[in-house]
Amino acid sequence: MDARKRGRPEAAASHNSNGGFKRSKQEMESISTGLGSKSKPCTKFFSTSGCPFGDNCHFLHYVPGGYNAAAQMTNLRPPVSQVSRNMQGSGGPGGRFSGRGDPGSGPVSIFGASTSKISVDASLAGAIIGKGGIHSKQICRETGAKLSIKDHERDPNLKIIELEGTFEQINVASGMVRELIGRLGSVKKPQGIGGPEGKPHPGSNYKTKICDRYSKGNCTYGDRCHFAHGESELRRSGIA
């Protein structure tokens, strides 16, 4: 009896809790039908547990096309990417994340969240928020991003709109904010920045500083920017 045990290495890897031998369904199929013999993919080998039989296994450990091909032949689950595993443990009740979000459960913390900042004229901050927060709430509700307005670190005439969320959420929210700024700027231009042609009043600080974003090539305001886009637009404070 001991000799038979030593002659079958696969038996040693398949002890059950009662001290006997336990064969997998796949192994029993190969013995009973004789169809194993490297004719089917090994489901254990292509699983997270791995195959304990190694070279003695009766099933294929290599299938052209890899896991996807083996999955189609044996009805295995599709592979779970590492990003999906990270997201499963990062948000929502019970540490699960569905990828769609539950509209009734509020915002979900999402793997890979980041922030983006937009500089705006301080006079536009209140209008961007809107009466009772109507504009900021709409942006947050439609995009899922968080929006907050903070003081500018260096210029008291500016405010910082900070957006927090995923790259896609921030991208959509930024577009909505800039569209809102464009509408507000066109309404305020006759009163806030000058005459009918949009020229600044002598006492304003319009175009008195070089635009940092323009120097870096990422200013999104274009002609609406309050800062100079080059030396040709730069003017001294108090001079029209």
Swiss-Prot record:
GO terms for biological process: positive regulation of leaf senescence; regulation of DNA-templated transcription; regulation of photoperiodism, flowering. SUPFAM superfamilies: CCCH zinc finger, Eukaryotic type KH-domain (KH-domain type I). The keyword Ligase does not apply. Residues 113-177 form the KH domain. GO terms for molecular function: DNA binding; DNA-binding transcription factor activity; mRNA binding; RNA binding; zinc ion binding. Disulfide bonds: none annotated. One of its GO terms (cellular component) is nucleus. A zinc finger (C3H1-type) spans 36-64, 205-232. Signal peptide: none annotated. It holds the Pfam family zf-CCCH. The keyword Zinc-finger applies. Residues 89-104 have a biased composition (Gly residues). Residues 1-37, 81-106 are annotated as: Disordered. Keywords: DNA-binding, Metal-binding, Repeat, RNA-binding, Zinc, Zinc-finger. It comes from the Eukaryota. This is Zinc finger CCCH domain-containing protein 52.
